[in-house]
C-alpha cells in the first residue's frame, strides 16, 4: 500500500487515539476532537462518498472556509481513490462555475464564508445556486452543518449525506486505500495566471509526501504541538500544512473562525508552528514597533543584556509567538527589516519560495542557514538552475503531474522534467536564491 495521508491518519488513530487533533471554534468555546474521533469522521464521509458511487479518479469540490468537514471531505475523497478540489470561500458564482465544471467534480460540499459580513448573496450556497444548472457533471451538493436557505433537486443535508454510507463496510475503505499509488492524483489546486481562466494544478500523493518529508531539513515538529489553521484551504500552502503536514506530524490544529482574526487567535493559542504571508507579519511588526517606541523602558530593556530576555518574552507573547519554534513567510516578498527585528527577538520567522506547481515549497531559509534578503536554499532532493534568460527552473519529486485537461499549458511549463517558474532570479555561490 502506498504511503498516503489517509493511511497515516489511521495510524494516528491507533497511536494517538485519545490525544487532541483538532480544535474548532463554537459559541461555547473550543470543541476538541481526538485523533480517533477525526479518523472516524473521515471514514464516515468516505463511506458516504462510496455510497454515492464516488469512484477512483472522481473529484470532490470543497466550497467553504476552513472547517472540520473540509479536512474530512478532502481526506475522505483521497481515501477512496478520488481527489479534493478547493474552491475559495470568497469565489464569485462565475469562478465557482469554472472550477467545479473544469474539474468535473461529481460532488460539491458547500459551507461558510465568514467574510460575507451578513450579505447572504456572498454566501457559498447562494452563489452556487446561481450556476448549479450549468454544472451537468455535478450529481450531489452537500450542505455542511448550519448551511441552508436554498433548495434544489441535487441538494442534500449533511445528515442525509452521511446516511448514504450506512451500508458500506470498513473493509471497502481499506481496499480502496490499498489500491492507491503515489502517482494517483490527490488534489486539484486552481491557480490564476495573468490571462485566461485558472488552471487546475494536478498534485499526486507522491508530490505531497515528498514535500512533507523534505521540510524536515529545516524544521521538525512532534505529536501534540500546536498549529493555527487560517490560510484558505483552497491555497496550496494551506492545503499542504493544514491537511498533509498536520496529519503526518500529529499536530494539534486550532481552526480560525475568520482569517481576519488570525493574530488574536495566535495570541490565544501560542502555536509552535505558524505559517503566514507578509501582510500578517507586517501587522505583527507594527504592533511590536509601537510597543518598543511607545515605552522607553522597553527600548532600554532591548538594549541591556540583563533585561532583554524579559522583554523579549513579553513581546513574543504579545505577538502570539511565545512558543513558536518556526514560522514561514512566503507568497510575496517581505521587508527584510521585519525578519531582522523578529529574529533579534528570538522569533524564528524565515522566508521561503515556491509555487502551486511544485506543491508549495522549493527553497527555504532556516536557523542554521539563513540569509535575509534571499528565499533560502533548495530542499533536499530538489534541483534548481537559472536559464539563459534568467528564469528559475525547478526539478524534483514535488513538481506537479500537469495542468488538468490542459496539455498545451502543461507543455509550456514542463520541459524535460524541468518546471519553468516564470520568475527571474539568481543563485549565489553558497546556493542562496534571490528572486
How would you describe each model-predicted region?
Residues 2, 18, 22-75, 92-97, ...:
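Conserved AMP-binding/adenylate-forming core of the ANL superfamily
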Residues 32-36, 186-212:
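Conserved AMP-binding A3 loop
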Amino acid at each position: 500500500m502506498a504511503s498516503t495521508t489517509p493511511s497515516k491518519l489511521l495510524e494516528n488513530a491507533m497511536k494517538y487515539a485519545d490525544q487532541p487533533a483538532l480544535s474548532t471554534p463554537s459559541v461555547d468555546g473550543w470543541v476538541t476532537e481526538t485523533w480517533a474521533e477525526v479518523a472516524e469522521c473521515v471514514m464516515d464521509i468516505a463511506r458516504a462518498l462510496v455510497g454515492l458511487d464516488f469512484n477512483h479518479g472522481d473529484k470532490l469540490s470543497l466550497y467553504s472556509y476552513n472547517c472540520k468537514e473540509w479536512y474530512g471531505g478532502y481526506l475522505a475523497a483521497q481515501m477512496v481513490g478520488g481527489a479534493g478540489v478547493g474552491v475559495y470561500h470568497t469565489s464569485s458564482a462565475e469562478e465557482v462555475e469554472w472550477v467545479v465544471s473544469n474539474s468535473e467534480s461529481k460532488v460539491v460540499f458547500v459551507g461558510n464564508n465568514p467574510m460575507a459580513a451578513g450579505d447572504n448573496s456572498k454566501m457559498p450556497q447562494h452563489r452556487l445556486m446561481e450556476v448549479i444548472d450549468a454544472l451537468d457533471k455535478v450529481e450531489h451538493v452537500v450542505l455542511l452543518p448550519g448551511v441552508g436557505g436554498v433548495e434544489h433537486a441535487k441538494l442534500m443535508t449533511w445528515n442525509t449525506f452521511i446516511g448514504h454510507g450506512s451500508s458500506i463496510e470498513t473493509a471497502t475503505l481499506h481496499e480502496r486505500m490499498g489500491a492507491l499509488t503515489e502517482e494517483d492524483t490527490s488534489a486539484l489546486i486552481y491557480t490564476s495566471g495573468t490571462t485566461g481562466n485558472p488552471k487546475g494544478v494536478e498534485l499526486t500523493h507522491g508530490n505531497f509526501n515528498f514535500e512533507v518529508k523534505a521540510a524536515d531539513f529545516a524544521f521538525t515538529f512532534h505529536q501534540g504541538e500546536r498549529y493555527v489553521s487560517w490560510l484558505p484551504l483552497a491555497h496550496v500552502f494551506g492545503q499542504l500544512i493544514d491537511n498533509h503536514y498536520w496529519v503526518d506530524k500529529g499536530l494539534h490544529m486550532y481552526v480560525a473562525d475568520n482569517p481576519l482574526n488570525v493574530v488574536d487567535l495566535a495570541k490565544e493559542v501560542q502555536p509552535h508552528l505558524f505559517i503566514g504571508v507578509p501582510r500578517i507579519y507586517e501587522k505583527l511588526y507594527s504592533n511590536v514597533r509601537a510597543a518598543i517606541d511607545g515605552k522607553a523602558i522597553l527600548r532600554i530593556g532591548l538594549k541591556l543584556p540583563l533585561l532583554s530576555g524579559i522583554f523579549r518574552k513579553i513581546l513574543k507573547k504579545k505577538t502570539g509567538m511565545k512558543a513558536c519554534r518556526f514560522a514561514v513567510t512566503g507568497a510575496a516578498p517581505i521587508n527584510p527589516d521585519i525578519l531582522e527585528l523578529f529574529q533579534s527577538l528570538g522569533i524564528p520567522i524565515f522566508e521561503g519560495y515556491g509555487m502551486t506547481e511544485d506543491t508549495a515549497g522549493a527553497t527555504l531559509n532556516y536557523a542554521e542557514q539563513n540569509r535575509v534578503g534571499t528565499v533560502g536554499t533548495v530542499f533536499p532532493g530538489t534541483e534548481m538552475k537559472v536559464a539563459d534568460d534568467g528564469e528559475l527552473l525547478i526539478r524534483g519529486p514535488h513538481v506537479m503531474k500537469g495542468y488538468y485537461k490542459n496539455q498545451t499549458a502543461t507543455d509550456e511549463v514542463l520541459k524535460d522534467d524541468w518546471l519553468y517558474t516564470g520568475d527571474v532570479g539568481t543563485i549565489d555561490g553558497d546556493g542562496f536564491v534571490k528572486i
